[in-house]
């Protein structure tokens, strides 16, 4: 997305009212807001994120300040309207707008992506059914990495529950009004590294992987965001961490590093979806060869397949 096309309007309030700011973030139509919300809703971190009444809300923090981010689709314009409330609003600038735009994949060109995938007869009907599908991102690369580690070999619902427990143990409540909206800051790497994760609901090896990753990020031993390293460096650094395998890295690459060609090959839902279309493709190696024709848009291919399953199941599946 071009930041030149982003409108940022500061709203000056009285001293007793927390500062706020509003942004209009343009996208290339069509934009499937309903399915973006469904994806976020099924994975919303308790206390940190919330999807309700067609709106996404979460706690965000930057430079030591925190506040609420609320995002809704404009009823007429091709844009999302993002409102920031609280101390963090003072940091709203082009870089902040770009971060929100990246989280909601506003820079994607659905016409180019759709035409690329629709060359495969598997995807032509999926693209026709959901032409504005996006790859939902994350506010923080570390937050998404935690989500990916916790989500190893468990259901979306189970992972969401466990991440909620992590927030309760290592996060910080930054909004104290009891209004039912998000109020918790996601744990910092330092806080999570120091947290006792006994009886958190994960196997010991996964707990060790999570704690080790938090320590590595806190120490600056591993890059977290694409602005600090290229994709090859990021993948290599994360694959070197104990307990971090290809699925975890590709999931992070898809949603946090914004690699449009990321492919979490061993994802059970994706593997089942491919095998259902061609029973001969029942092995990881043969499936990966089949995906070569989907380059450079395999992350969007994954979302289309997950979305198809979610449409049938009526809930979040995969990722």
State where each predicted segment sits.
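HhH-family (HhH-GPD) DNA N-glycosylase catalytic core used in base-excision repair
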Residues: 1-319
């Amino acid at each position: 997305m071009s930041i030149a096309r982003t409108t940022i309007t500061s709203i000056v309030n009285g001293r007793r009212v927390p500062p706020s700011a509003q942004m209009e973030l343009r996208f290339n139509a069509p934009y499937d807001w309903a399915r973006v919300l469904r994806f976020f809703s099924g994975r919303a971190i308790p206390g940190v994120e919330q999807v309700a009444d067609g709106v996404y809300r979460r706690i965000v923090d930057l430079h030591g300040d925190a506040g609420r981010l609320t995002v809704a689709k404009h009823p007429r314009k091709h844009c999302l309207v993002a409102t920031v409330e609280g101390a963090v609003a003072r940091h709203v600038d082009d870089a902040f707008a770009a971060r929100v735009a990246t989280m909601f994949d506003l820079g994607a060109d659905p016409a180019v992506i759709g035409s690329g995938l629709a060359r495969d007869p598997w995807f032509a009907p999926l693209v026709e059914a959901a032409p504005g599908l996006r790859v939902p991102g994350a506010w923080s690369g570390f937050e998404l990495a935690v989500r990916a580690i916790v989500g190893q070999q468990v259901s979306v619902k189970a992972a969401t529950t466990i991440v909620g427990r992590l927030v309760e143990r290592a996060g910080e409540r930054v909004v104290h009004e009891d209004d039912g909206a998000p109020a918790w800051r996601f744990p910092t790497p330092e806080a999570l590294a120091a947290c006792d994760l006994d009886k958190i609901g994960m196997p010991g090896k996964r707990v060790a992987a999570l704690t080790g990753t938090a320590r590595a990020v806190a120490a600056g031993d591993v890059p977290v965001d694409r602005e600090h390293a290229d994709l090859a460096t990021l993948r290599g650094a994360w694959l070197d961490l104990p307990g971090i395998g290809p699925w975890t890295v590709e999931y992070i690459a898809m949603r946090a590093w914004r690699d449009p060609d990321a492919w979490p090959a061993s994802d059970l839902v994706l593997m089942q979806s491919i095998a259902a279309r061609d029973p001969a493709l029942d092995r990881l190696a043969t499936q990966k060869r089949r995906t070569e024709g989907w380059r450079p848009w395999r992350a969007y291919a994954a979302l289309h397949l997950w979305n198809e399953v979610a449409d049938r199941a009526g809930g979040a599946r995969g990722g």
